[in-house]
Amino acid sequence: MKRLVLETTAPFQGLPELVAFDEGLFQREGLQVEWADREPATAKMIQANLTSPSEVDPFASHGRLFEQGQADMYNACEWGNYCRVQATGKSGRQVGRRAIVTYSALVVAPHSPVFTPQQLANRVIGVPFYFGTHYIALHMLEGFLPRHEIKLCSAPNGSRYRLAALLSGEVDAVTLTEPHITLAEKKGCRTISSAFFHGTE
């Protein structure tokens, strides 16, 4: 049986792999899949002083264990993986689009004065640089605002951390994925814009 070590994934981006693992589908195909946990080393807080992707490591989360030789494969957003493939030290490459399309939303806190994308001009938006939710924030806002009025800062990987930062008032808006979009709405937050994006393996 061939052994394959995958970096851990989340349901919003890797549900097919998680189901295949739980249902024994990999084993039926002769693959012994193991998971390498990338979560413990990832940042969990807003870094408002970091306002550009050039100020952070593209391998801070996705691809980190692959680059260290501790995983054979990982999935992440297509745009971030273009950057990672360019910066790889291990001849990493994209082998194809992942089997799931991700839904993302730009969300504000319950008492925010923001109701439209235009009102986010010069307000701090927390995004995880090199992630799909970073690039989709730009796509969602550039139709409404000139680029110099879009103010991004480094936010943690993981919607739960970004939602907590939003609710505590650390940022004016964040990008989220499910199930945290629904959780945010249940807490009174408002979705300002939403869109879908691809990822790759």
Question: Which residues fall in each region the model found?
Answer:
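Pocket-lining segment of extracytoplasmic ligand-binding domains
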Residues: Y161-E201
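Short, glycine-/small- and polar/acidic-enriched structural segments
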Residues: K2-L145, E149, C153, D172, ...
